């Protein structure tokens, strides 16, 4: 969503690329951030080129703000190394924001790296888990997604990983996913199992007396 205000100040979208580029050199972080926001929405290669040098800035907060904004430019898809370095960082700010960028702009990074990063930081991730939608469909990734699903402790995480599995591996893995979802402690995941069962004709009897009313109702619904 395009912001109009940043930290109480209106973002100067009306300024030229040249004027905004000068703001990038300001020692004041607020000026830098305002310029990044405005430049990131300029449909102009020169705006992207003005931002690009700051991916190597010595100030980590400037690098972080560039990470959060530069990928609005289609040309930034070339900055895979920058993005992979961000999610490989020991700094969770870079990891989380890098994963969110991958999710939002569907930037393709190494599958093995993405899975290892999500696995490493899983307990601390929320919407960043959505980066898993960019994974290729293959047996190895399926096994790793199932392992992530099994290890996840938050319902929202399991729900989203479950949706990724269902989106990418049905109908070929329908029986396995039905069984995986059926025994989950979260009702929302058992609801997902019922949807799989109804689509592929699996037995719903186990859900007819489920402790959760929503699960029972969906199982009984013709």
Q: How would you describe each model-predicted region?
A:
Residues 19-27, 50-58, 82-90, 113-121, ...:
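Alpha-solenoid HEAT/Armadillo-like helical repeat scaffolds in large eukaryotic proteins
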Residues 1-13, 22, 30-44, 49-53, ...:
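Structural detector for internal amphipathic alpha-helices that build alpha-solenoid repeat scaffolds
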